[in-house]
Regions:
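Solvent-exposed coil/turn segments that connect beta secondary-structure elements
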Residues: 64-66, 88-90, 101-102, 127-129, ...
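Surface-exposed loop/edge segments in extracytoplasmic proteins
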Residues: 104-111
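Beta-strand cores of secreted/periplasmic/IMS beta-sandwich domains, seen most often
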Residues: 72-92, 120-128, 132
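Extracellular/periplasmic metallocenter environments
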Residues: 27, 31-33, 46, 53, ...
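Beta-strand signatures of extracellular beta-sandwich domains
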Residues: 95-99
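Sec-dependent bacterial lipoprotein signal peptides
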Residues: 1-27
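N-terminal edge beta-strand
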Residues: 51-81
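Low-complexity, Pro/Thr/Ser/Glu-rich flexible segments characteristic
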Residues: 35-58
Length: 152
């Protein structure tokens, strides 16, 4: 076989091997799904309401790239609440606010921006029992909302 014909015959194989090697290399560099997610906390599961030593109720919500809060519902007693939102998404920025007009009383604190990998905490006081809607206002139409119930 003449050298030019051999180059044509071998060229596509070398290209395919090179592409396959690049894919394997890049896949190895990309890491697994858990390495890119926010590190799990050693505290209670998301949505579990606990009472801190200072008497404030604490709850953590988590969100990812799937446009939901985990959990999307939790219950607290009237009083002070410390709410942490963890954005475990790889790509999506979220926010958190209590839906204006969706509850017995207004809750003002909000988290305007929460980039992937960030966690932010707000504190507020609720005195009136009832259901309070919350949302990511960027993704409400995609179903990213939930309910905090104040019971007691």
């Amino acid at each position: 076989m003449p050298p030019a014909a051999r180059r044509l015959a071998v060229g596509p194989c070398k290209k395919a091997a090179g592409v396959a090697a690049a894919v394997v290399l890049l896949t190895g560099c990309g890491g697994g799904g858990t390495a890119e997610q926010a590190a799990p906390s050693s505290g209670p599961a998301p949505g579990t309401v606990t009472t801190a030593p200072d008497g404030v109720q604490e709850v953590t919500l988590q969100t990812q790239d799937d446009y939901v809060f985990t959990p999307d519902a939790f219950t607290v007693a009237p009083g002070e609440v410390r709410l942490t939102v963890v954005n475990a998404a790889r790509q999506t920025t979220h926010n958190f606010r209590f839906t204006p007009g969706d509850g017995p009383e207004a809750i003002q604190p909000e988290i305007p921006l929460l980039a992937p990998g960030e966690r932010r905490t707000i504190e507020f006081t609720v005195t009136v029992p009832g259901a309070y809607g919350f949302e990511c206002s960027f993704h409400t139409q995609l179903g990213q909302f939930g309910t905090m119930t104040v019971s007691g």
